[in-house]
C-alpha cells in the first residue's frame, strides 16, 4: 500500500516552497557590451532593488516574482540568472569545495536535470571542460548526499548551472531564462546578417521613439528593428510569446508567472502608429512580414519594397533607425561605402528627421558626409560598431 504523506509533511513542503519564493536573491543580467546602462535603466523602471552595473552585466536583488518580471519584460538583457555563490578558485579542489558548499537542494529537486556550462578567463583553471566536470561532480555529490541517492536520474525539468572563472574567482549561477532572451519567439526565419533583437531594441531605445513620431527603417531586412519599435510603441512585453527555463520549476509557484504576465498585458497601450519598413529585396521583405505576423504586430507596420537611396521621405519629420549593409557581411566594403555616400546625399536636407544608424565602418561619418551629433560604441555580437546619432 502506498504511503499517504502526512499533513505535517505537506505543510513543511508548502512552507519550504513559500520561504524560497519569498527570499531575497541576487540576480545577474548579462548583456551585449555597451548596453549595460540601458539594461540598468530598464530594471530601475521596473522598480528592481539595488541595481548595479558592471561590464557586460547588471545585478539586482529581488524574489522569484522579480525574476519572472525581468524575464518577461526585459527588452535589452540576454538572460536572468540567480547568483548562487562567489568564491576563490585557483585549484580544482577549491572549485569542487566551493560548488559543493552551495545549497543547490533549495532549487533543484531530486529528479532535476542540471547541465553545466561556463567559461574561464585569466585564471589558473583555464580548461573549461575540466572545470565543467568538477562543477558537475560537486553538484552531484551535494545533491546525492542531501537526497540520499547514489545515482541522480535527472529526468525532470532542467536547472541550467552556469559558472564563470575570472582572475581565479568563480561565480556560479542558476539560469532562469533557458533560451536567451533575445529570442522572442517571432523570428520565423532570418535573412543574412540578422541584428539581435536585444540590440534592435537598444537602437529603438536610444532613438527615444515611444510611438508618437513617424518611424522608418529604410534597410529593414528581416524586420527586427521595426518589430521592436512596434513592441515598444505598444509597451508590449517581449517575453509574452515564449517560455522560460524557470517556468516549470517546482520551487517557483505558478501564480508568480501568471501574475507577472497578467501585469504585463495590463500595461499595454492601444493606438495607431506610423511605422515603415522598406527594403530593396522582395524576398527579404516577405521574411519581415512573416516575422511581424508571428510577433502580432503586422497591422502596425507598413512594409514596402524600395531603394533607400531613392525613396522619398514619408513625411517632414520622424525617427529613422537602421542597420545598413556594411563590408563585413553582404556587400564588399567599397560597395557599402558607396551606398553610405549615396544614402547620406539622399538625406542631406532631411533636417526634420532624427537619424540613428549603427555601423562597423570606422570612417562612416566621412562616407555619410556629416559628423554625428553623438556617437555610442556598441557590439553587435562580436562586431564592434558605433551608433551614429543625428538630431
Question: Where in the sequence are the language-model features?
Answer:
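Intrinsically disordered, low-complexity segments enriched in serine/proline and basic residues
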Residues: 5-6, 12-14
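C-terminal catalytic and target-recognition region of SAM-dependent MTase-like enzymes
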Residues: 308-310, 314-391
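Short beta-strand/turn micro-motifs composed of small residues
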Residues: 31, 279, 359
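S-adenosyl-L-methionine
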Residues: 23-45, 52, 58-75, 129, ...
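Methionine residue identity
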Residues: 1-3
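Non-catalytic nucleic-acid substrate-recognition regions in nucleic-acid-modifying enzymes
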Residues: 17-157
Amino acid at each position: 500500500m502506498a504511503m499517504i504523506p502526512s499533513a505535517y509533511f505537506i505543510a513543511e513542503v508548502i512552507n519550504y516552497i513559500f520561504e524560497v519564493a519569498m527570499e531575497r536573491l541576487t540576480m545577474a543580467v548579462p548583456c551585449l557590451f555597451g548596453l549595460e546602462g540601458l539594461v540598468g535603466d530598464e530594471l530601475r523602471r521596473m522598480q528592481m532593488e539595488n541595481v548595479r552595473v558592471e561590464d557586460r552585466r547588471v545585478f539586482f536583488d529581488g524574489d522569484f516574482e522579480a525574476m519572472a518580471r525581468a524575464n518577461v519584460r526585459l527588452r535589452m538583457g540576454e538572460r536572468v540568472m540567480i547568483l548562487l555563490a562567489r568564491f576563490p578558485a585557483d585549484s580544482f579542489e577549491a572549485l569542487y569545495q566551493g560548488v559543493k558548499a552551495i545549497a543547490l537542494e533549495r532549487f533543484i529537486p531530486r529528479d532535476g536535470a542540471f547541465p553545466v556550462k561556463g567559461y574561464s578567463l585569466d585564471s589558473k583553471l583555464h580548461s573549461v571542460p575540466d572545470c565543467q566536470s568538477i562543477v558537475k561532480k560537486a553538484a552531484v555529490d551535494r545533491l546525492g548526499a542531501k537526497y540520499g541517492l547514489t545515482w541522480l536520474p535527472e529526468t525532470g525539468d532542467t536547472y541550467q548551472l552556469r559558472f564563470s572563472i575570472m582572475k581565479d574567482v568563480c561565480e556560479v549561477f542558476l539560469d532562469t531564462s533557458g533560451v536567451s532572451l533575445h529570442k522572442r519567439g517571432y523570428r520565423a526565419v532570418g535573412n543574412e546578417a540578422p541584428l539581435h533583437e536585444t540590440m534592435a531594441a537598444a537602437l529603438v531605445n536610444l532613438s527615444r521613439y515611444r510611438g508618437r513620431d513617424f518611424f522608418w527603417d529604410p534597410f529593414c531586412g528581416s524586420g527586427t528593428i521595426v518589430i521592436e519599435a512596434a513592441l515598444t510603441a505598444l509597451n508590449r512585453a517581449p517575453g509574452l510569446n515564449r517560455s522560460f527555463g524557470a517556468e516549470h520549476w517546482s520551487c517557483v509557484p505558478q501564480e508568480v508567472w501568471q501574475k507577472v504576465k497578467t501585469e504585463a498585458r495590463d500595461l499595454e497601450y492601444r493606438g495607431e502608429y506610423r511605422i515603415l519598413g522598406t527594403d530593396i529585396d522582395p524576398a527579404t521583405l516577405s521574411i519581415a512580414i512573416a516575422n511581424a505576423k508571428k510577433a502580432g504586430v503586422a497591422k502596425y507596420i507598413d512594409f514596402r519594397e524600395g531603394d533607400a537611396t531613392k525613396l522619398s521621405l514619408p513625411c517632414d519629420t520622424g525617427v529613422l533607425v537602421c542597420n545598413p549593409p556594411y563590408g563585413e557581411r553582404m556587400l564588399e566594403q567599397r560597395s557599402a561605402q558607396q551606398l553610405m555616400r549615396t544614402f547620406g546625399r539622399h538625406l542631406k536636407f532631411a533636417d526634420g528627421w532624427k537619424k540613428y544608424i549603427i555601423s562597423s565602418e570606422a570612417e562612416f561619418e566621412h562616407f555619410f558626409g556629416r559628423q554625428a551629433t553623438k556617437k555610442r560604441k556598441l557590439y553587435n555580437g562580436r562586431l564592434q560598431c558605433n551608433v551614429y546619432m543625428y538630431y
